[in-house]
Structure formats: structure tokens, C-alpha cells
A protein has these predicted regions:
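An acidic-aromatic substrate-binding cleft motif
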Residues: 1-22, 29-36, 283
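Polysaccharide-binding and catalytic clefts of secreted carbohydrate-active enzymes
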Residues: 101-292, 296
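Aromatic-lined substrate-binding rim segments of carbohydrate-active enzymes
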Residues: 24-31, 39-103, 232-240
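Carbohydrate-binding surfaces of carbohydrate-active enzymes
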Residues: 195-198, 230, 242-243, 273-276, ...
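Short, well-ordered coil/turn segments that N-cap beta-strands
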Residues: 5-9, 34-36, 68-74, 136-141, ...
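Short, acidic/polar
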Residues: 18-32, 123-129, 251-261, 330-338, ...
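Conserved, mostly hydrophobic/aromatic
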Residues: 11, 30, 38, 67, ...
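The substrate-binding groove and active-site-proximal loops of carbohydrate-active enzymes
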Residues: 9-18, 43-58, 105-124, 149-153, ...
Length: 677
């Protein structure tokens, strides 16, 4: 795929929203401002098939031919997120339903269900016609499947979903006896004696379902979305030229994005809206990372696809007329946020959208241009970003210079979605590790653990955190043991290993399958009550916060106690241990990796401030390293409305201005510097 071999800029464009007289001037203005790709079509089903079976592609033929003649590249979206009125009215079984089983009505988007045979038939027909008609068009470089799979809702509760769920379960368990055992249906007399008795989780008397059913249901939702995506991809590839790529945009919940990226798509793309970190009615909080927090999501995206694209990069104020209110990017923020994406691995950045829509639900979801279509500050910033992107082309294809990894599995991701005990600690640790890494300028990767993950993939990282592997499998345990035996450091947190893959709690002490490696047994555990003071421990003479959840650990012979509680009813009990395994070691922390705790781990494990000899910077700026063929680059990003001072330890080349810099350097408000090191 040639598309990401150079960094480039794009924009989302809706030719169906505008008079054709604007098309040519719009495209020329885009090109004049450094925009070379447009995404189109993802909501335009009714333009292509106004009545059932009546396909008319002449509208987009004219636009695509104009793109070809002007030199504009096109990413064409399949418009399956917005079925036309004739379809949903004639075939109501294609609609999704709410928890009470009531069908959604026409008039929004993403109101269909993935499992309706009729919907899949209509989608397959349309996508096939599109691919056959445009699969060799010279302007098209790629295709986007649907739009934002699992956005708006990731619950699918229609009759078609219920039927498909039962088929999914029959394939997985083969017999009701196996299902009843895995789900523990003996509890509350939930035992099933006929497959037809099982349904997707509709409203019940207690607003609570069997957690093992819910875990399998979330897996089913993901499998349904992936099947829907794969169906379209397979159809496209029958007709499109090999030079064209297939992608989709995300990232949303109850979806195995890693599986989709690796086995269905050519490249993964993300929609980045940093200003949603602000609440319009909130006051500024210095401890909050605000728009800088988007780097957490970009780090997740990088685990899905190391070299990804941004399909929708925020360019203006955001919101629907009835919900969501995000303010206009201040001068400099538009380019800052785009560079934030590039710093974390994006080699393509497409802004949403070219011109703000004067009609419809998204009249406040501003584009680069306002309703009046005049040149403005935001367009000038887009042009400046495009020019700056050319100055750093040498960074294209570089990996992120991650100093440690945070392990994740899809089972634990889905379990944390349905289990509040798991979800609370998981979210707290992910947020805490991210904040600590930001404050200590320590880039990290999320590392997805799969059945086919190879040991060398883990050995890239001297330290791996597995914060809360509630669900732990034997093959995962074996891989982690091999990693440690070869010299790696594994750090685990509380609530590790107390469930199997079905969500059942095996009758064995925590940390379950890792007990042999940790040499510990969990004796006591509890959430911290809001009425209680936060527990503390002491590690290497410094305080270690134990917040949110507390465990006391019983060490075996050969396991060293590194920290004990100094407060709470667990005072004196071990909370942090270390055990040597082969050439490596395992640290077991009986708590959550809050910001303070995670920062203490990064410092004590020698991970914090990896670039401090080159760049000394306040924790108010972000530093991200990228590396390729032995060459490294540092992105220094200032998210604040005032300049920040950094100190360069040696002479470095600033790529954006071509100057050499050393000593004290000022990073202006809402600005970025890129250094070759």
C-alpha cells in the first residue's frame, strides 16, 4: 500500500450537501492549502439508490471525474451507516431495538442491526454495485467500510440479534449442558433447557443479567460487527484494484479492533476530537490533562495499528443541536492537535470537515470553513500544518520510542465492560499509568496479548505492566513466564487471576495462575470506602499510595517484601513484593496504579524521564519519541495558553524551522517543536 509511504493531509467532504457549482473551487482551494485527499460518500445511500433496486451513480461519477482531473485523491465510504427511508420502512426487521425490544425509527444514523439477513443482503448488493462501478476509478485510493462501527450504540437487541446470538452460542458450546456449566445457571434457577429460551439481554426485573451471559453477549456484538465489516471488505476486494486500501474509522467499544485491523483491513484509522476533554461548563483543573488526554486514545490506536491514519481530526467547535458542546480551537490548537496525532504514529491526517453543514443534526459540528465559506484562521492553520508536515517527512513510518508496555487482552477489555468491580480498577490504573507517563515524559505502548503473540513481541519492552488481568488463561501465563525467565520485569496489580474465560471465579487463591511466578497469596482485599482515608505504604523510603482497592499479600519463601501498609486496618501487611524468576522478576502490587503509585513505579524501575539528558521540560508539556533505522526524533508539545520553557542538553536540529537549538528554548502557547536527535 503506497498511501502511507508519505505523510499527507486530507479532509472529509460531502458533495451531496453543496451545489455542484462549488465543487471545482472547493477542490482547488483544498489543493492550494495542502489538502490532497477527500473522504466522501459514507452517508449517501439515498443518492445512490433512491428507490429499491434503482441504482444511479451519475452524481458521484461527476464528482470523481472532477477529482481525477484536478489531482485530488479520494477515499470512498460505503454508506451503510445510514440506510434510506424506503429500506427501514419496508423492512423494519433491519432496525435495531432498545432494551425493551422497541424498534428504533428512521431519522438518525446507525439505527440498523448487523444481523438482519435482509440488511446484509441489501448492503452486499449496494457495496458490490459500488465496487464494480468504481473499483478501477483513477481518483480513488481507498475505501472506508461503513462509518464508526459501534458508535452511538453498541447494544444490539433486535429479533435478528437474538436469533444470531443463539447461533453464536450453539457454535461455541455445542450443548446446553456445556453452556449451563460455563454460565453457572444454577444460580437463581437460570438453567436453560431449550436454545430458544436464551435471548440478548433485554430489560428484566432487576436490571441485571447473568455476568457470563453478558460477557458472551459482548463477544457476540464484536463478532457481529466484524462479520459485517468482513462481508463488505470481501466484496470490495473482488472488484477494486490492488493499489486501493480498505479501512474503517473508530475506535469504539464492544469491538475487537485488533482482530479487525489484523485480519480484515489494510490500515486502521481513528477519529480524534481532543476538545471533548473539556466540559463547556467545567472550570480549569490543573491536575486534569484535558486535550492532552487524547494521547491516551492515540496510544490505544497505536496498539491496533502501529502506523495508522486519522480519518477525522477536529478542526472546529463540535456538537449536535441537542447534545455535545465543545468550544472552538484557540489559535494554534488545530495544528497542535494534528501534530499530537502525528507524534503518536499517524502518517495521514484528515480534518473533519471542509465546510460546516448549514442543515441537519450536525449544524454545530464545525469544519475548517464556517457557513459563509470564506477563508479564515482555521484554514490558515491547516495550510501551516500541511507545510510543517512536509518539513518532517523523514519521520514517516517511524515507530514510537516506547520505554515500557501495558498489557491488555480482549477478554479483560470485554469483562471490564460488564463487571463494575473490574471496570473500576481497570479504568483507574489505565488513567493513572497514562498520567504518570505523561508527567515523566515516558512514552509507552499498549501491548495486545493474543493466542498468537510471540515472545519477541514482548521482549521489546524491559518492563511490562499487567494491571488487572482478572481473566487469565494458561497460554497467557506460559508466555508471561517465558518473558520473565528471559530477563523481563512483569508488574501485576490487584484483582489478578480470579476469573476464568467464562467469567466464573475458580475456587483457588489469587493471583490464580500467576501464584507460582509471584510467590504470593492474596489474604485480604477490599475497595477503599470514600469515608476512609487513602491507605499508604512505604517503598524505598518514599510514600506509595494504595487507593481504590487494597490487597494484603502473603509471601512465600524466596519472595521479597518491598512495601508494607503504614496506614489503614492492614497496617504492617505486605502490599508490594518481588520474586526472581529465571533472569527476570515479577512485582506484585496489591493496589491500583493511580497517578501517584504509577509515578513511583516508573521512577523506582528506572523508566521515568528517559530523555532528560537531552531535554529537561516541565511536566506541563508532552514529549513523545519516534525512532526509525537508528534515527530518533522528539516531539515536544505545549497544550497550555502560555509559553513553556525547556532546556536542551546539547545542540539539536529543529525540523520545523531548520535552526539549531541548545540551552533554554521557549515553546510558544499551543505549539509544538520537533527535534532530530
Amino acid at each position: 500500500m503506497d498511501f502511507l509511504k508519505t505523510m499527507s493531509v486530507g479532509v472529509c467532504y460531502y458533495p451531496e450537501h453543496w451545489d455542484e457549482s462549488l465543487w471545482e473551487s472547493d477542490l482547488k482551494r483544498m489543493l492550494d492549502n495542502g489538502i490532497h485527499t477527500v473522504r466522501i460518500g459514507e452517508f449517501a445511500w439515498s443518492i445512490m439508490e433512491r428507490e429499491e433496486g434503482s441504482f444511479d451513480f451519475s452524481f458521484f461519477d461527476r464528482f470523481l471525474d472532477l477529482c481525477a482531473s484536478t489531482g485530488m485523491q479520494v477515499i470512498f465510504g460505503t454508506p451503510t451507516a445510514t440506510p434510506p427511508a424506503w429500506l427501514t420502512c419496508r423492512y423494519p426487521e433491519t432496525l435495531n431495538a432498545n432494551a425493551d425490544g422497541v424498534l428504533y425509527r428512521h431519522g438518525g444514523r446507525r439505527h440498523y442491526n448487523y444481523n438482519s439477513p435482509v440488511y446484509r443482503e441489501k448492503v452486499a448488493l449496494l457495496v458490490g454495485k459500488m465496487a464494480e462501478h468504481w473499483g478501477r476509478h483513477p481518483a480513488i485510493v481507498g475505501w472506508q467500510i461503513d462509518n464508526e462501527l459501534n458508535c452511538e450504540t453498541n447494544d444490539f437487541l433486535s429479533e435478528a440479534d437474538g436469533k444470531a446470538f443463539r447461533v453464536f452460542l450453539q457454535k461455541k458450546y455445542a450443548s446446553l449442558d456445556a453452556l449451563n456449566k460455563a454460565w453457572g445457571t444454577v444460580f437463581w434457577s437460570q438453567t436453560y433447557t431449550d436454545w430458544e429460551q436464551i435471548d440478548v439481554p433485554h430489560t428484566n426485573a432487576i436490571a441485571s443479567h447473568n455476568p457470563s451471559l453478558l460477557l458472551d453477549y459482548v463477544r457476540f456484538v464484536s463478532a457481529s460487527a466484524l462479520s459485517f465489516c468482513a462481508m463488505q471488505t470481501e466484496i470490495l476486494r473482488k472488484f477494486i484494484e490492488p493499489r486501493m486500501f480498505v479501512t474503517t474509522n473508530g475506535m469504539f467499544g464492544r469491538l475487537d479492533n485488533h482482530e479487525m485491523a489484523r485480519n480484515i483491513l489494510d490500515v486502521y484509522m481513528y477519529d480524534s476530537y481532543p476538545n471533548f476533554a473539556y466540559g463547556i461548563d467545567q472550570t480549569w483543573d490543573e491536575d486534569s490533562l484535558h486535550d492532552r488526554h487524547s494521547s491516551l486514545d492515540l496510544t490505544r490506536v497505536r496498539s491496533i495499528c502501529p502506523h495508522f491514519g486519522i480519518m477525522e481530526q477536529q478542526s472546529g467547535a463540535n456538537g449536535w443541536y441537542n447534545r455535545m458542546e465543545a468550544s472552538m480551537p484557540r489559535p494554534g490548537q488545530l495544528e497542535l492537535w494534528a501534530m499530537q496525532s502525528v507524534a503518536h504514529g499517524a502518517d495521514y491526517v484528515s480534518f473533519f470537515r471542509w465546510r460546516t453543514s448549514p442543515v441537519g443534526t450536525e449544524i454545530y459540528w464545525h469544519g475548517i470553513l464556517d457557513y459563509d465559506s470564506r477563508d479564515n484562521r482555521r484554514l490558515r492553520e491547516v495550510k501551516a500544518f500541511a507545510e510543517d508536515l512536509e518539513k518532517i517527512q523523514e519521520v514517516c513510518g517511524a515507530d514510537t520510542d516506547a520505554r515500557f508496555g501495558v498489557l491488555q487482552t480482549v477478554d479483560n477489555q470485554f469483562d471490564a465492560d460488564v463487571d463494575h468491580w473490574h471496570g473500576r480498577v481497570q479504568k483507574a490504573s489505565e488513567e493513572g499509568i497514562f498520567a504518570a507517563a505523561q508527567e515523566t515524559h515516558t512514552t509507552f505502548d499498549f501491548v495486545d496479548l493474543r493466542q498468537n503473540t510471540k515472545l519477541e513481541e514482548l521482549e521489546r519492552y524491559p518492563v511490562l505492566f499487567a494491571p488487572h488481568f482478572v481473566i487469565l488463561k494458561e497460554e497467557e501465563t506460559a508466555l508471561l513466564k517465558a518473558y520473565v525467565e528471559q530477563g523481563g520485569t512483569l508488574v501485576i496489580g490487584c484483582r489478578t487471576g480470579y476469573k476464568d474465560a467464562s467469567g466464573r471465579c475458580p475456587m483457588q487463591p489469587m493471583p490464580g495462575l500467576l501464584r507460582e511466578m509471584t510467590g504470593t497469596t492474596v489474604e485480604e482485599y477490599t475497595f477503599r470506602s470514600p469515608a476512609e482515608d487513602m491507605a499508604e505504604a512505604e517503598w524505598n523510603g518514599r510514600k506509595l499510595h494504595v487507593d481504590c482497592f487494597m490487597e494484603s499479600l502473603q509471601p512465600e519463601e524466596g519472595t521479597e517484601v518491598l512495601a508494607r501498609y503504614t496506614t489503614s486496618y492492614l497496617k504492617g501487611e505486605p502490599v508490594l513484593t518481588e520474586r526472581t524468576v529465571g533472569k527476570g522478576r515479577v512485582l506484585h502490587f496489591g493496589g491500583v496504579f493511580t497517578r501517584q503509585a504509577a509515578r513511583r513505579f516508573l521512577k523506582n524501575l528506572g523508566l521515568a524521564e528517559p530523555y532528560e539528558d537531552l531535554v529537561k521540560a516541565p511536566d506541563t508539556v508532552e514529549i513523545v519519541g519516534r525512532v526509525k533505522d537508528g534515527q530518533k526524533w522528539l516531539f515536544v508539545l505545549n497544550y497550555l495558553p502560555e509559553a513553556q520553557e525547556i532546556r536542551l542538553g546539547e545542540e539539536l536540529v529543529s525540523l520545523l524551522d531548520g535552526e539549531k537549538a541548545e540551552g533554554r528554548v521557549e515553546i510558544p502557547a499551543y505549539s509544538v517543536a520537533v527535534y532530530r536527535i
